[in-house]
Every structure is written in C-alpha cells, then in structure tokens.
C-alpha cells in the first residue's frame, strides 16, 4: 500500500502464531537511491534469537556505515567477494539473543536509542575516475538554493509583495514586526498536516487555497519577513519522529522540516506558522530535536535548539458537598505554551477522541463539556459534575480526599528498573492544582 509519495508499505502475516511461537523471516530491499539508504533497525519489542544484516554493493561504490546504538554484533564480516559475476563488497553483521527493547517514560522518540545502521555513499570509482560524494552543510545549503521546491520558491519574491498591511510594514522593532507577520500567516493559512523540507503544490497554491504543507507555510513566512526588511534565514532540522539529525553526515535527504530564523542584534528568534498556538521562540514540540542547520546567505551554521519556555497546566476544581453526601461543581483544565499547542492540535485533529480521553480519565458523570481557546494562546477544557463517588461514611464521619478526583496514587517517575536513556521534557513545566470545597453550614472539618 502507498503511504507517501515515495514510500510504500508491504505487509505479511504469519498464520497460527501463539504465545511462545518462534517466527522466522527474511527480506531483501532493492533501492534506486544509491546515495542515502533507509535506516535498518536492529532491536524490536520482542526478543530475537538470531538476526543478520547483509549489505552488498559493487566494488566501484564506496560507503560509510552510520551505526548508532548500544547493541554490538557477535559476528562481523566486511570483505570483497565475487557476486553476480563481478567484484562486490559485502558487509555482514550477526546478532544473537537480542533482548527486547524496553521503552521508558519521558523519551521523545524511542528510535533515537534503538540500534540501527544506515549506509551512506561517499565515493564512486568508474574506470579509474574517482568521484567523492562527501559533502558539507555548506554544500547542502548551495544545493537547496538550486532546488525549485525550496530555493526556487524563496526566489519568487513577487508572491510576497503588497501582502502585508502598511501598519505591519511600518513597525520599527524587528521582533515586534516578525511577531505580527507570524500572527498574520497563522490566521490566514492552514497547515494540512504534511511535514516536509520541500514544497508540494508550491507557494502559489498555498496563496490560492490557504492550505499547504509545512514547507509551503514556513517558506512563505520567510518570504513575507524578508519582504518586510527583516534578516531572516531558513533553519532546517529533523522532526522528533524522524530521529535526531546526524550533523556528522551532511546530506539533503536527512532533514525533513524548515522554520524561520530571525537574526537581530546577534540573537536568533525562531518562528513556525504551522501551529495556530506557536509563538516567537516557541515552536511546536515536533520541531525541538536538538540539532539544526541555519542556512545563512554565505554559510551554513550548526545550532542546538531546545525549548526553555515554561508550560503550565492549571487544574481547578470548585466543588460543593451536599447534605446527601454527593459532590457537585465545576472543573477546568487549562494549558499554556507548549501544552496548549499539544492540546489544541489534538482537539482539532479529532474532537470526539479528545472528549473520549476525558471520559476515560474521569469515570464519574459530567455534563456541559466544553473545549475552547482562552486568553489568546491558552487552551481550556471544562465540565460540570455531580457524583456520589467521592465520599465514604465511617463511624458517623464523612471521609473524602481533599484533592477529590485530582488525587494520583502513582506518579510518572515510578520506574523501578535502572534507567538507560536521558530524561527528555517537551518543555520545563509546572502543574498547579487548586481545589475549593464548600461544605454545608452545619458541617465542620
């Protein structure tokens, strides 16, 4: 089945598989993409008795092996041999008794830590004519300028003329002007959910339809900022789902995302208009993945990006204890900054599933459920409740937990086994719980 423009999925099944069954399979991948092959992951969520990785290629190709992870092969062969009637090089890696990969809380992408290998072409030698494919990020910058669906789009300056209001154009402070342009793009154009370094239908289509992929929206954001006289460059990176960008192996095929970067008084400010809730220097969580490359006019600069803006969750319960021992009241769950981006995007993606999440988390009866934008860039869900499930009667006394349904017996840092991977937060965060309880006049604590 076709998953994306250049990707297909092949599925197969094993009949009569039961707990404890040992399955065996082999597959061969033939790729026309000689320069950058896909990663092959060598750890799974099931134990593996034996697995083997084989990479064969003609001797006139030269490859580097980008090997990442903590799993070491028990057997390794890297040698020349005769195959298919000509000289080949062959890499064979054998792994025995591989334990299952165990995921841990507070890890953005498990695949960053799963052992994998990726061959990358570094040279060819046809008829003693040697050609090196080793590149730098400056080379990548130069090539992207030539690509019609990247640099070619940025060069269409006429698409950004006479678009912004004169009020925006006249703002003297660069950061304030950039913020207004970000707001304009967010309110005018809508991201279609597709991530990419390159445009799909092009920026002209974005202008006509008001919908586009991430590259179309953010490249147009760059064009508008430049038209307004700002010093703005594209910054390319990997999204979290793509894995950390390996800066040691520069290639156009690695990054899959681009945002706008304003340089002002020696400082950098990042902008991403794909999310309606993003702010200056507050990107959607998918974009915070450590390594990034800033494509300046004359050079490429390697940067590290992290989210240092604190997000807060405010959980507010205003409850009344009735004389029949029921509780009634109102609950508000309000998120700010990164948490607001996540909540809003999840809500817009599927409103029914978002409400279902609350019904599964809070199993008592509630009504007047509402999710909405509040205070400009905050997202809030609220509901009213009436339940008899919070109070126990013991010896003529009524006993209830003062946090009511906000009480949690376990926390997310309850891992008992030794931790293997770094703790990764989407942002610094704080959770504030406030519970106000009104009791009948003739009751006392």
Report each predicted region and the residues it spans.
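A sensor for short, sequence-defined functional sites
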Residues: 1-445
């Amino acid at each position: 089945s076709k998953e994306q423009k250049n990707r297909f999925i092949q599925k197969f099944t094993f009949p009569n598989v039961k707990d404890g069954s040992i399955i065996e399979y082999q597959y061969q991948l033939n790729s026309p993409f000689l320069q950058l092959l896909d990663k092959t992951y060598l750890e799974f969520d099931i134990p593996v008795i034996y697995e083997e990785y084989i990479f064969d290629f003609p001797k006139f190709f030269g490859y580097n092996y980008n090997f990442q992870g903590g799993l070491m092969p028990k057997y390794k062969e890297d040698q020349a041999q005769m195959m298919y009637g000509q000289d080949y090089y062959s890499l064979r890696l054998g792994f025995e008794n591989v334990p299952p990969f165990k995921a841990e809380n507070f890890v953005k992408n498990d695949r960053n830590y799963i052992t994998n290998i990726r061959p990358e072409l570094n040279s060819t030698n046809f008829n003693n004519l040697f050609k090196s494919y080793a590149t730098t990020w400056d080379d990548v910058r130069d090539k992207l300028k030539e690509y019609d669906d990247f640099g070619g789009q940025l060069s269409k300056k006429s698409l950004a003329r006479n678009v912004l209001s004169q009020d925006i154009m006249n703002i003297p402070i660069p950061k304030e002007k950039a913020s207004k342009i970000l707001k304009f793009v967010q309110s005018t154009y809508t991201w279609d959910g597709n991530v990419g370094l390159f445009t799909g239908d092009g920026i002209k289509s974005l202008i006509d339809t008001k919908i586009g992929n991430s590259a179309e929206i953010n490249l147009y954001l760059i064009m508008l900022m430049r038209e307004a006289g700002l010093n703005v460059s594209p910054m390319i990176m990997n999204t979290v789902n793509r894995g950390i960008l390996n800066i040691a192996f520069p290639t156009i095929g690695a990054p899959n995302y681009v945002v706008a970067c304003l340089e002002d008084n020696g400082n950098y400010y990042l902008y991403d208009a794909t999310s309606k809730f993003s702010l200056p220097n507050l990107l959607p969580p998918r974009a915070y993945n450590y390594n990034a490359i800033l494509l300046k006019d004359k050079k490429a600069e390697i940067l590290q990006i992290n989210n240092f803006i604190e997000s807060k969750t405010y959980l507010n319960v205003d409850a009344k204890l009735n004389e029949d021992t029921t509780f009634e009241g109102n609950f508000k769950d309000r998120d700010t900054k990164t948490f607001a981006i996540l909540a809003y995007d999840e809500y817009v993606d599927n409103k029914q599933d978002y409400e279902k999440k609350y019904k599964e988390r809070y199993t008592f009866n509630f009504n007047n459920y509402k999710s909405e934008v509040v205070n400009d860039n905050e997202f809030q869900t609220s509901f009213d409740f009436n339940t008899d499930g919070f109070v126990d009667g013991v010896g003529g006394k009524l006993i209830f937990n003062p946090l009511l349904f906000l009480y949690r017996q376990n926390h997310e840092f309850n891992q008992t086994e030794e931790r293997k991977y770094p703790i990764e937060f989407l942002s610094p965060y704080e959770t504030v719980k406030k519970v106000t309880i009104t009791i009948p006049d003739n009751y006392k604590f």
